[in-house]
Amino acid sequence: GNAPVQMGAENARKVLKHMNRLDVPVLIGADKPLKKPYTDALDTHGRDGLGESFLENAEGPLNTESANSFLRRKLREERCSLIAIGPLTNLAHLIETDEDAFNRIDRIVSMGGNYRSHGNCSPVAEYNYWEDPEAASIVYRQMEKMGKQIEMIGLDVTRQIVLTPDLLSYIERLDPHEGAFIRKITKFYFDFHWQWEHLIGCVINDPLAVACFLDPEVCRGFSAHVEIAEEGICRGQSVVDAYDFYRRPHNAVVYDKVDVTKFFYMFLERILRCDRARLDLLDHLLRNHDAYGKEGERDIRI
């Protein structure tokens, strides 16, 4: 994903250490896309992949079982659902090595793609699908073959989930320990957004996929046939046939609207482990929260 796989695994364990949840297994998946060389996003997330926080590694060895082995074993035991917050390489490998196991996945929520919003690594492509479009294409085609729909949490909705300085200060007031941790791991990301998009704050993409998985009413959208461009100038673009031009089976639910207030209540209730009554100022803070505009777009030509 955004960081090389070993670094990403260590970062996951650093966060779990902070949460006192090192009992949660972290497994290493593919270290490169199916066909092209790997391109990281450390320019966005810092040299350590975690906002240049340079936190100490968690003690103990990494799990030696591969992500592919774990998925195959787990799906033989029971049906599962997945939240994919990176490129879809591991799921493509699963299809190629054990299609029956993949077919036992009940639900896939994927943070990736974009419908009407501009891309973040090309004019038309979002990073996760751009990084491995062949893998994304394999997964979307398999969903069509199965008669199922992947849930696409794309930039149209994630760009409306902006952690602003006011929200971060609010978190620090409510819980100085958690607030300090979040500030430390997002400072580089805040600076990146200002430098490249003149946005005061940072878009927090992945938590929206988790929120939508837990409560499908956080986002709204429509079903459509989606294909992923694998090469050329549009490489990685999620081509959404919103008007049934091709008359192909709908293999995706494309979310294009998000209840920002509902999301932030869910987000803060969980990371701060508090009830809604403590968040009495949140509505006020979100009143003018439309940092990117209603459709996740901004004019950044300045």
Residue ranges and their predicted role:
Residues 1-48:
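Active-site rim/loop-helix segments in enzyme catalytic domains that contact anionic ligands
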Residues 1-14, 54-160, 165:
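Active-site histidine-anchored catalytic micro-motif
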Residues 4-7, 34-35, 114-118, 227-244:
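Short, mixed-charge aromatic SLiMs
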Residues 26, 139, 210:
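A residue-level signal for conserved active-site and pocket-lining positions in enzyme catalytic cores
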Residues 39-47, 122-126, 167-170, 243:
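Short, surface-exposed amphipathic charged segments that create phosphate/polyanion-binding patches used
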Residues 44-54, 189, 243-246:
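Short, basic/glycine-rich phosphate-binding loops at helix/coil junctions
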Residues 49-59, 193-196:
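Short glycine/proline- and acidic residue-enriched helix-loop micro-motifs
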Residues 130-134, 147-302:
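Conformational coupling and interaction surfaces
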